[in-house]
Amino acid sequence: MATAASAIEYSSVKSIAGPLLIVEGVEGAAYGEIVEVICPDGEKRMGQVLEAREGLAVVQVFEGTTGLSTKDTRVRFTGRTAKIGVSMEMLGRIFNGAGKPIDGGPEIVPEKELDINGYPLNPVSRKVPSDFIQTGISTIDGMNTLVRGQKLPIFSGSGLPHNQLAAQIARQAKVRGEGEKFAVVFAAMGITSEEANFFMEEFRKTGALERAVVFINLADDPAIERILTPRIALTVAEYLAYEKDMHVLVILTDMTNYCEALREISAARNEVPGRRGYPGYMYTDLATIYERAGRVKGRTGTITQIPILTMPDDDITHPIPDLTGYITEGQIVLSRELHRKGIYPPVDVLPSLSRLAGNGQGPGKTREDHKKVVNQAYAAYAEGRSLRDLVAVVGEEALTDRDRAYLKFADEFEDKFVRQGKDEDRSIEETLDLLWELLAILPEEELKRVDRELIEKYHPKYRKK
């Protein structure tokens, strides 16, 4: 139902501040309400109410306020919140950050319209995330297993290949099992035109676009559109998952650009800043995005999230990765040191963690040896890494044969396991077999974290017999 304000067109714009209009004398306006801004030349722009109090409404104009004046600008309140029309026709299409097609195809004929803010899930109705999602990336599938319904962010840094990794995951991700329907929803926020062309070309040339819905918000698009983009993407994901029984992987990049837009809008509203100038409600705002991942009782479909963010100055204690870590279930950390060595993807498995990995590992999901062999590989790699520091002090000549074996394991682990081609799609079986081949570098008596029967079944020494 329209509010009282929706019946009236206001010409009482009090002031213009950056992308914001302050309209006075407004009655019945609601937070999040969509408004129509009529420019002096008759052009119509869209906006959204950010604040409504004591007869004042603060409106963020999607297309910016250039050319507007306080005298001749009119504002009409629609009484509606932001919605997007959804349909299965969206698969295989590319949209801008506001949900408009930019691939030259026809407009989408919506099956229904959904509020982009979604609907809160009762915690009791949630199911524990489980079941393996294969990305084809060994450091994720093997060491930091992703499961359906999980939210697992990638912490990157400026200049690291997170875009290439995001595109590779979007191309290769799949769920195992007969008759399972899978889709990818990809949302890029605040990226350059060059990056946008890279993503669109990657999806088109590999055929991955057929099962994907792509949203692209460019760096020169309005900040408010950047705030809407992940919510629009997740609304489409919820439609595919909960109404079409699909398993949906949502990739959001770059959440740092999203948070910068949040800070920009907060500053324009003269809000009291929190840590490093970001609004004090950033934690809550991020939670409204991340918490839309999950599994729901009685529904077949699932929503899994991989948010990607660049850590300013590679600082993992920065508010954006810090708050993201509180809400999500682990993190994949990209390493500048590995990148300098020419290793792709430069995933540092030691600070990386998937808190729900155990729910997707083991018989019937991956393989019976998964948990044990990964634990052994973690311990061996950590030992080898610590020995590198020792070698820098005393030299390799001072090492025992055992130490040299661990040092060799660490080098081979990075060169053969972590390093992967940008088009190399490894199955989980290939990933686990590769771990066993690397563990064969160590003396057998060092494999204390793996059961004897697993060693005799999977160790290369016994498999060759």
Swiss-Prot record:
Pfam families: ATP-synt_ab, ATP-synt_ab_N, ATP-synt_VA_C. It comes from the Archaea. It is a peripheral membrane protein. The keyword Plastid does not apply. Its main location: membrane. Belongs to the ATPase alpha/beta chains family. This is A-type ATP synthase subunit B.
